Design a protein with these regions (language model features):
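Short beta-alpha connecting loops at secondary-structure transitions
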Residues: 63-69, 298, 303, 332-343
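Extended hydrophobic/aromatic segments used for targeting, binding, or gating
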Residues: 210-242, 307-309, 313
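Non-cysteine beta-strand/loop elements that form the S-adenosyl-L-methionine
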Residues: 55, 237-249, 320-330
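Divalent metal-binding segments
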Residues: 2, 7-18, 22-216, 222-224, ...
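Glycine-enriched alpha-helix->loop->beta-strand junction motifs that scaffold or abut catalytic
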Residues: 236-240, 291-297, 314-323
């Protein structure tokens, strides 16, 4: 493959590539017979980009899901209209929505429920995911479908339609087969993204083998459960194991001693931890546990959505990384202004 007229450090050159090797760089190269030629017209030639925080299966599923939150949907009426329109296009099928966020503020009483979906949504099974990824909201037909799969649903779930990620009794019924990742991989490659870090907490050895089989030519680092260490001998130059993912929330935070032990065990495997931290409490507990365990240069914080100056200084002292999503400031500005305390 021959790249013509590319920008390399402010100089225009031609670059010849074969496989994963750069063979030649010169001001002018002549195309060989049968060689693919790409005319860059002065555009920069960059190494492949790496997405350091992605949920591959969830992102692939979202490509075929209905957007149920800002900026596409900005009110409950717009949500109802979108759900009914989607159901009309695919009658009798599940309507799967993602990205929902309460339009009046992210308090529990503002979140729609089963009754709202029954009254305002379509006459088919509906399942909507809160933007946090922690909550699914079902209508009655959706709950009936779960019952038919043998899920054990509490009275509270039947009343609200709310199923949180901690409701282990319904995880098997909610679980879907691995997604076809080919469309997502094509999209990533079209952006110049040639490698990703898969950050789903429940990633297991089985997930590792599935990614190994179905994600070429994408390079992948897969974080997840401690048991991923069993795949160390199956790691390749393209797919390898990464951090132990820690994923707790304010309502179910472990003790400092428990979290410290988890971090110590990850370090004993030669792995860092990647800790999901979107609240002040989650971040402070994580930093305290990393300090108690002894920080590793491999340790990192995911999101770091709320960081006080004190916490920032602590992160610097521990010399650990932060993988955040700066685009959230633009995409979620209104919600942040509404929901986050000003003194934070």
């Amino acid at each position: 493959m021959l790249f013509k007229k590319v920008d390399l450090e402010n100089n225009i050159h031609d670059v010849r590539v074969h496989g994963d090797r750069i063979l030649d760089i010169a001001p002018e190269l002549v195309a060989e017979e049968g060689e693919t030629v790409i005319h860059a017209n002065g555009g920069a030639l960059l190494p492949g980009l790496h997405d350091h925080h992605i949920h591959m299966n969830a992102t692939a599923a979202a490509l075929n899901s209905l957007s149920c939150g800002p900026p596409d949907v900005a009110s409950e009426q717009e949500l109802a209209d979108a759900l009914n329109k989607a159901a009309a296009q695919f009658p009798l099928q599940w309507v799967r929505g993602v990205g929902y966020y309460p339009f009046k503020g992210n308090e529990e009483h503002n979140i729609i429920d089963c009754d709202w979906l029954d009254k305002n949504g379509p006459d088919c099974p509906v399942r909507i995911q809160h933007r946090s990824g922690r909550l699914w909201i079902f209508n009655t037909k959706g709950l009936d479908a779960l019952n038919m799969k043998g899920a054990l649903l509490s009275d509270d779930i039947h009343r609200t339609g709310h199923i949180y990620d901690t409701d282990a009794s319904v995880q098997e019924a909610l679980a879907s087969d691995p997604q076809n990742l080919s469309d997502l991989i094509d999209i990533l490659l079209s952006y110049g993204i040639t490698g990703v870090t898969e950050v789903t907490p429940r990633n297991s050895p089985e997930d590792f083998l599935n990614y190994l089989k179905h994600t070429a030519p994408l390079k992948m680092t897969i974080m997840g459960r401690p048991t991923l260490i069993d795949m160390i001998d199956k790691s390749t130059a393209r797919v390898n194991i990464g951090h132990v993912k820690l994923h707790y929330h304010d309502h179910d935070l472990p003790s400092l001693e428990t979290l410290t032990k988890e971090i110590e065990e990850a370090h004993s495997q030669g792995r860092g931890v990647a800790s999901h931290c979107v609240t002040h409490a989650e971040l402070l507990l994580t930093l305290a546990a990393i300090e108690a365990a002894g920080p590793s240069i491999k340790d990192r914080i995911e999101h770091a959505a709320i960081v006080t100056q004190e916490a920032l200084d602590w992160i610097k002292q521990l010399n650990i990384g932060v993988v955040t999503q700066p685009s959230f400031i633009v995409a979620r500005d209104e919600a942040y202004q509404q929901d986050i305390e000003q003194n934070m």
